[in-house]
């Protein structure tokens, strides 16, 4: 027997008569109280998004799944709910959470509370732990051999021991204060997001299953991804990298490496590349002749004197402003909708055949010659801009 209530329900008076109720879904209402003391057969409760100041579940010993996200609970007593396997209590003002009796718990979702500590020493069956956006300064995970997903970002962690979590596939630990991260035992790892920590080194040589790597906003001076041949997404922006070897990463579709110190970037093996952001580096050349699948290119604020895009016919967005370009031929890039090439000493810009331009900026350059033909189609706003900025051919 189950019950699902629609929105705008203010009271559940009379629910005590449903002695055999097993599932109750009453989320998104205005319930200020919820008495389930007579519903002892209840196994699943979804009461999220209600202004509940308290929730007494001491009589609901058969409860297996509980979702009380975004209520007003300052306390949550689950000591009698020993059958619980899944708990979601996000967005409450909880300062503590006692789960010592919930030894069957496999999924714990407790983000956006005010937790400063989380003792999970009795919850060795955990497979998913999402405890982000709290105030945690430490997290002991040594007992969780089965842990697959860990989201502990937006906390105050200074260290993270994952040596026993060999089943871990997804690790999101960004926005902490980590100075080191040992992943040598996490060979099953598929996704890693460790951006905005204090990492000076990152050894990924044992993480050959990795497909997504986000490690931006760290003081990394080098990054070796030569063994991570399955990578499809790499975001390593805002580091201190002087070199980046991607010749072994042929599956890459997205590379995001702005704000480093790169002087060269070899992309000849990355034929699947669709999005490239390499702005604010020290690149003097950029060969994209093998990257025919690329649709978005952000190479602004480098030192490029030339840019050949004749083979990149799938390109839809181009940001090459802030370089040293004197000419730019885009006549073969007929899918382009956005072009930003300002802050270059351009004397010639060829937009012949372009019929999809929505935005174009080439700066206040009275010497520029904009070449167009009958196939060139721009909006009235774009044409007005062009007429005011270009020299008449």
Residue ranges of model-derived segments:
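Conserved hydrophobic beta-strand positions in leucine-rich repeat
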Residues: 1-5, 24-26, 43-47, 64-68, ...
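Leucine-rich solenoid repeat scaffolds
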Residues: 339-393
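LRR N-terminal entry segment and analogous cap-like coil->beta motifs
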Residues: 1-34, 39
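Intrinsic low-complexity/disordered segments
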Residues: 35, 77, 111, 140, ...
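N-terminal non-cleavable signal-anchor helices
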Residues: 65, 108, 149, 191, ...
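Canonical leucine-rich repeat
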Residues: 12-15, 34-36, 55, 76, ...
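Leucine-rich repeat
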Residues: 17-21, 38-42, 51, 59-63, ...
């Amino acid at each position: 027997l189950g019950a699902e209530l629609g929105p705008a329900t203010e009271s559940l008076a009379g629910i005590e008569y449903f002695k055999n109720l097993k599932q109750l879904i009453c989320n998104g209402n205005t319930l200020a109280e919820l008495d389930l003391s007579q519903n002892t057969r209840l196994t699943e409760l979804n009461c999220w998004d209600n202004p509940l100041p308290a929730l007494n579940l001491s009589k609901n010993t058969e409860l297996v799944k509980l979702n009380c996200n975004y209520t007003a609970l300052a306390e949550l007593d689950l000591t009698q709910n020993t059958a619980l396997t899944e708990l979601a209590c996000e967005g409450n003002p909880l300062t503590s959470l006692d789960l010592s009796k919930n030894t069957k718990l496999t999924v714990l979702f407790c983000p956006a509370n005010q937790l400063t500590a989380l003792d999970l020493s009795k919850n060795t069956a955990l497979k998913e732990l999402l405890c982000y956006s709290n105030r945690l300064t430490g997290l002991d995970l040594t007992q969780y051999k089965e842990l697959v997903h860990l989201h502990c970002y937006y906390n105050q962690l200074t260290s993270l021991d994952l040596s026993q979590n060999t089943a871990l596939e997804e690790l999101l630990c960004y926005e902490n204060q980590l100075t080191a991260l040992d992943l040598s035992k996490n060979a099953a790892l598929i996704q890693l997001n460790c951006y905005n920590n204090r990492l000076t080194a990152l050894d990924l040589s044992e993480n050959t299953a990795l497909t997504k790597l986000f490690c931006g906003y760290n003081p990394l001076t080098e990054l070796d991804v030569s063994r991570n041949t399955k990578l499809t997404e790499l975001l390593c922006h805002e580091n201190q990298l002087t070199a980046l070897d991607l010749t072994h990463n042929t599956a890459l579709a997205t590379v995001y490496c702005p704000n480093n110190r790169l002087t060269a970037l070899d992309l000849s093996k990355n034929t699947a590349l669709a999005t490239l952001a390499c702005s604010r580096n020290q690149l003097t050349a950029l060969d994209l002749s093998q990257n025919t699948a690329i649709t978005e290119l952000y190479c602004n604020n480098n030192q490029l004197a030339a840019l050949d895009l004749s083979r990149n016919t799938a390109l839809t967005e181009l940001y090459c402003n802030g370089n040293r370009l004197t000419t730019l031929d885009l006549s073969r890039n007929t899918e382009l909708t956005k072009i930003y090439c300002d802050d270059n000493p351009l004397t010639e810009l060829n937009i012949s055949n372009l019929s999809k331009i929505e935005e174009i900026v080439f700066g206040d350059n009275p010497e520029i010659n904009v070449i167009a033909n009958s196939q060139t189609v721009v909006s009235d706003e774009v044409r007005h801009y062009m007429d005011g900025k270009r020299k008449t051919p």
